[in-house]
Amino acid sequence: MLKRFRPVSLILLVGALGFSGNLYATPMSGIPRVDISQQNAKVSGIVEDALGPVTGASVIVKGTTNGTMTDLDGHFTLDNVKKGDIIQISFIGYTSQDIPYTGQSEITVKLVEDTQKLDEVVVTALGMKRDKKALGYAMQELKGDDLLASREPNLANSLSGKVSGLQIVRSSNGVGGSSKIVLRGNNSLTGSNQPLIVVDGTPMDNFTGGVDDVWGNSGADMGNGLSDINPEDIESMTVLKGASAAALYGSRAGNGVILITTKSGRKNEGLGITINAGITAETIFLKPDLQNDFGQGSVGVYDNQSRLSWGPKAMGQMVTDWRGNQIPLHTYDNIDAFFRTGTSFNEGVSFQQNIKGTAVFASVNRSDDASITPRSKLNKTNITLRATTFLDEAEKWKVDAKVNYINQNAHNRPIQGVNPSNAFNTIYNLPRSLNIREFEDDVDEQGNMIWYDASKNPQENPYWVTRYRQNEDTRNRLLGNISLKYAPTDWFDIELRGGTDYYTTTKSEKVYAGGNTSPRGLYTEGSETFYENNFSFLATARKDNLIDRLGGFVTFGG
C-alpha cells in the first residue's frame, strides 16, 4: 500500500559529466566512402552499443580542442577535420578508439564493454550471487571503497564517472541539494527517468527536488532520497542497465535498477571496530561570464534605480548612488563577495561481531554541513542495526533482519529557480556597479528591508533573505527488512522477504514583515507522510554439470 502527500515543483538542475573509456569503430554499413578534396571537412556518425544509441560519448580530434559529444540519439557531427587527423572516441567503461580520418563522411561506432572481469561473482536483479558471464543483461558492480574515495555527502554523487552510461545531474544548491541519476539517457519527456533504488532487496523511494512556495515560485531544494543512505554502510553497489534485468520489480524498473548491499556482521568470532572522520569543502566552480566595463543604467546613461548594467563605462568617475551619496563608479565581483566556502564534517563508528553464530553489524554516523549560502546548514544522524543467524545446527534455516533510522534537520535551504528570494538569481541580475556588501545592514529603523530599487520590484536583499525568510524541515525515516531462507539441499532454496520504507517530513516557513514579496509577513507549516511495504517469495534451483558441462538455473517467485 502506498500513501503519499507531496506537492509538485519544477526544478532547474545543473550538472557536469566527464567521459573516458573503451570502444571500437567500424565503417557504417551501406554507406559509401567519400573522398573530400577540401582541406577541412565535416564528419557525421552515430555511437551505439548492444542496447542502442549512447548519449554523451566524447568525440574529439586527437591533440586538439576540436571536439563534441553525442546527442540523445547517439549522433554527432564534427567540423574542421583534415585528412590524416585522428578522431578519438571515448566513453566510461569502454575501450577508447583512435580512428584515422581518410576522407569518410560518416562512421558508426560500436561500443563494447570491458570483458576482463567476466568471471566475477555479482549480485543480480533478484538479489542472488551469480557468475557475471552467465548473466543475460548489462550490469556493473562497485565496491564500497570505490564509493568512499570521493567522500561525497550525497551517495548519488559518488557514482559520477564510475559507471558507463550513467549521468549524475546535480543541483547547484551545494550541500543538501538534490542529484538526479539517469541511466543510458532519458526515456520519457514527462515521467521519471531515474532508476529504481533497491537496498538489501527492498525498494526505497528516491524522491528528488523541492517544493514550491505558497505563490507558486520554485522553493527550497529538499534533496533526494538516496542521500539518506550512509556511504560507510555499503558493501557493494550493482547497477543493472536493462529493463530485462529487473523482472522482479515490474515496470518502475524500466529505467534500470541500482542494487545496494549493505554490510553485515563478521563470519568468524571476534569484534571489529571501524572509526571514520572526514571534512570536505566546496566553492563555486563556474561563475557566469559577466561584463565588467559598464555600470548601472542603460544606453550609456547612469541611473541609480535601474536594474540594468549598460550605463556609462565605469572608470572611477563620481556619480550619485541610490542613497544620494557621491561615489566613484566601479564594478564588483558580487558572487565571491556574498557566497562562502561550504564545509561538510562527517564522523562515525561501526561494529562487526559474531556472537555465538549470530553476525551483528551496528553503525552510527553524524554529518554537519554548512552550505555556500550564508546561514544555511544541514544536520543528519544515521543509525543502522543488522543481525544474521541460522536457526538450526545444520544451517538450513537462515534469518537476516535489518533496521536503518535516519534523522535529518535542515535550516534555511537555499531557494532555487526564478523565486525573488533566490540569492544567486538576485546577485546575477544586480547592476555591476553595485556592491552587494552595501546591503549587509539589511533593515532600517522601522524594520523594513533595505534595497536599492525604490519601486519595490519582486527582488529581495539576499542578506535579508538569509536572516528574515527562514525555512526549516525535519525528516524522520525508517528503512527495514527481514528475510527467512530455507535451503534443504545445496542446489535448492526458498526465501521469503518483507521490507518497509516509511518517512515523515515536516516543513515550515517564517517570513518577517518588511520584505518586498510579503510586506506584512508570512508563516506556513505542513507535513507529508510516505510509506511503502514490499513482500516477495522466491524459489531457486541451480545445478552444475547436469549433462557433461551443461548446467541449469531456474527461479520462481512473486
Feature roles, as predicted:
Residues M1-L385, T389-A401, L479-G480:
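Short, small/polar-rich motifs associated with maturation and membrane association
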Residues K117, K133, N193-Q194, V199, ...:
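Surface-exposed loop/interface segments of Gram-negative outer-membrane beta-barrel transport/assembly proteins
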Residues F492:
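An active-site-proximal structural segment forming one wall of the substrate-binding cleft
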